């Protein structure tokens, strides 16, 4: 049994509860447009792309999850730490509940939000989302000590991915697949434990 499983079993004997985003966070959009971007500006400007651009003014100063309202639905996620500006069609999810670690929520969104959106889609693709869809998304709430332990493990994989990116692309792909596997296992909260590695050290 892994440390995560031991903690969940000991601290959550009745199982892990889930809560919808509307009970945990504030959700809203920005008010900036792409034309407001300033090359070389001091603040990140989150639009609807994989990488933020720059701007010379900021709207928010906090830790939040950013997702696009159009394009890249379920594939683009950012987490902010400090001052930033936000596009009028990008969503800011700012957690106000003391029961959740934003970094944990970020990893959970990255792992589960796309399938949540697709399960409610009327077609094979989703080109845009609205605030009510985000508010209905359910997030598990294991004790903070469990959330922090999961974040620590996934941060390690994230840091390793960044180091490998400049070195070996093939190795990076293997590590990314490993990261995604363990991310999904750690965040599944079902009754089937992840497979244990065989052999001994």
Residue map of PLM features:
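Charged, alpha-helix-forming regions
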Residues: 1-201
């Amino acid at each position: 049994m892994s440390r995560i499983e031991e903690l969940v079993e000991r601290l959550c004997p009745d199982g892990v509860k889930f809560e919808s985003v509307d009970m945990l966070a504030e959700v809203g959009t920005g008010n900036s447009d792409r034309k407001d971007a300033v090359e070389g500006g001091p603040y990140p400007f989150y639009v609807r792309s994989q990488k933020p651009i720059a701007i010379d003014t900021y709207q928010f100063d906090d830790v939040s999850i950013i997702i696009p309202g159009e394009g890249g639905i379920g594939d683009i996620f950012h987490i902010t730490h400090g001052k930033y500006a936000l596009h009028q069609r990008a969503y800011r999810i700012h957690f106000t509940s003391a029961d959740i670690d934003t970094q944990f929520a970020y990893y959970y969104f990255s792992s589960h939000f796309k399938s949540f959106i697709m399960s409610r889609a009327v077609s094979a693709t989703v080109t845009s989302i609205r605030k009510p869809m985000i508010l209905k998304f359910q997030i598990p709430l294991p004790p903070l000590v469990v959330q922090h332990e999961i974040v620590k493990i996934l941060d390690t994989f994230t840091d390793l991915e960044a180091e490998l990116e400049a070195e070996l692309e093939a190795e990076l792909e293997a590590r990314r697949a490993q990261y995604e596997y363990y991310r999904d296992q750690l965040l599944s909260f079902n009754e089937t434990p992840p497979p244990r590695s065989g052999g001994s050290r």
